[in-house]
Amino acid sequence: MDQDVAEEILNKEYEVVYEGKRFLLKPAKAWVLQPPGKPGVIVALFKLPNGKTVRKVIARLPP
């Protein structure tokens, strides 16, 4: 990931739905997951107010 793109992803708030509740959170960590021969996705870790950590796909990369 380009440095500017990575910084933009980490500073943006995303809507995370967990157990029927919606949260607007900034990711704690994000990375690209791209299996060979398939389009990739950007996965992020979010820390919920109750202390749990959840993963969510926040973007899809072009093939």
Curated annotation (Swiss-Prot):
Q: Which UniProt keywords apply?
A: Chromosome, Cytoplasm, DNA-binding, Methylation
Name where it's found: Chromosome; Cytoplasm
Q: What's a Gene Ontology MF term here?
A: double-stranded DNA binding
Q: Name one GO cellular component term.
A: chromosome
Q: Which family does it belong to?
A: Belongs to the Cren7 family.
Q: How does it assemble?
A: Monomer.
Q: What is this protein called?
A: Chromatin protein Cren7
